[in-house]
């Protein structure tokens, strides 16, 4: 046993974590009227609240949607995909319906499968959210693991992430192609969005866990998505030992996020996500939710000050700097877009973009 190996049956063992006995849909609790606040990470909630509170930032995003339009965006995402239904990908459809029921989502959002070996999924849209599932994910994961991924994406929808995630995807594509409006200002917005985007993944990991109600399933899915191996080739307990190494230093997680900013990564490392999710479980919040102790949809939402207060314990200075950078970059980006539009209209024979 190495210094990171968990003792058998101890707190680091997946078998000992709360909720382990809830594997399999027959025994899962339906979380009636559960509010997304139940699973949202304080840093994600505060950052998103801050983004929504900056009018110029939201204006920039909606102007981009005005330029491209929601329908063309939907078609672009769905052009090479198949919509899931009882007759198309019936296995995926059945698993998805169970997730919708467990999380008591208001409705089943359109779900598509796209042919690509890359193991991934995403939730996109503006007023009409939809979920896109890569075929590589469908092939790699077993039923429970796939339900974790589906619940994760439903969590993004219910938390109101899809508008910003869609804009993130568009801006990344524009940046890669050197589109005229994507200069330093837009890249500043990208950095700010990336910071929130990664925090939002931590929230949806919690939603994914609530959708399957078995930590072992989540850790196994993350392990497969990190390494691509089969159950015979990998061992969950050793993967958890990797995650334990990330908890040896209080400052390491923040350092990892800073490195990811430099690398331009959209997702935190899976080992870091395992560590974050285990920390949340150990607070008792997960068990309380399964006992029915959670905020309901329709309950009064906490105020802005309270939202910031939750995050301030570990995130206050970082969040303040984050919002300031977003506000400054968004103003510059707005001016850049408007100037580009004016230049397009002023050119003879050109009707704008």
Predicted regions span which residues?
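Alpha-helical membrane-targeting segments
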Residues: 53-72, 167-193, 250-264
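Short helix/loop segments within enzyme catalytic domains
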Residues: 87-93, 99, 103-105, 182-249, ...
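Extracytoplasmic and endomembrane cell-envelope/extracellular-matrix remodeling and assembly machinery
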Residues: 224-265, 276-307
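Catalytic Zn2+-binding segment of zinc metalloproteases
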Residues: 154-173
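Active-site His/Glu-centered metal-binding helix of metallohydrolases
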Residues: 141, 150-159, 203, 207
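Hydrophobic or amphipathic, alpha-helical segments that drive membrane association/targeting
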Residues: 1-127, 287-291, 295-353
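Short pre-active-site segment immediately N-terminal to the catalytic Zn-binding motif
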Residues: 83-87, 91, 132-148, 192-198
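Divalent metal-coordination and catalytic microenvironments
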Residues: 96, 133, 152, 204, ...
């Amino acid at each position: 046993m190495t210094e990171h190996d968990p003792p058998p049956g101890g707190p680091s063992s997946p078998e000992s974590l709360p909720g382990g006995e809830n594997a399999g849909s027959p025994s899962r609790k339906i979380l009636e009227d559960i509010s997304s606040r139940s699973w949202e990470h304080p840093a994600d909630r505060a950052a998103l609240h801050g983004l929504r509170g900056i009018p110029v930032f939201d204006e920039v995003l909606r102007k981009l949607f005005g330029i491209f339009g929601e329908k063309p965006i939907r078609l672009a995402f769905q052009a090479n995909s198949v919509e899931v239904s009882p007759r198309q990908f019936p296995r995926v459809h059945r698993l998805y319906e169970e997730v919708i029921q467990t999380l008591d989502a208001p409705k089943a959002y359109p779900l598509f499968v796209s042919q690509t070996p890359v193991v991934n999924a995403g939730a996109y849209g503006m007023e009409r959210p939809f979920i896109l599932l890569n075929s590589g994910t469908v092939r790699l994961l077993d039923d429970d693991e796939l339900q974790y991924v589906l619940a994760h994406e439903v969590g993004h929808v219910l938390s109101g992430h899809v508008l910003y995630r869609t804009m993130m995807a568009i801006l990344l594509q524009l940046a890669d192609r050197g589109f005229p409006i994507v200069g330093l200002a837009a890249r500043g917005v990208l950095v700010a969005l990336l910071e929130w985007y990664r925090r939002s993944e931590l929230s949806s990991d919690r939603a994914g866990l609530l959708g399957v109600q078995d930590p072992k399933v989540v850790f196994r899915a993350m392990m497969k998505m990190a390494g691509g191996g089969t159950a015979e080739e990998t061992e969950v307990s050793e993967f958890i030992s990797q995650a334990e190494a990330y908890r040896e230093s209080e400052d390491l997680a923040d350092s990892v996020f800073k490195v990811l900013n430099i690398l331009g990564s959209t997702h935190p490392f899976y080992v870091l996500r395992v560590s974050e999710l285990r920390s949340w479980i150990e607070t008792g919040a997960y068990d309380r939710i399964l006992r029915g102790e959670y905020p309901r949809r329709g309950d009064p939402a906490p105020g802005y000050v309270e939202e910031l207060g939750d995050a301030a314990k570990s995130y206050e200075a970082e969040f303040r700097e984050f919002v300031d950078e977003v506000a400054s970059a968004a103003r510059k980006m707005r001016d850049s877009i408007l100037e580009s539009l004016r230049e397009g209209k002023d050119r003879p024979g050109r009707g704008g973009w």
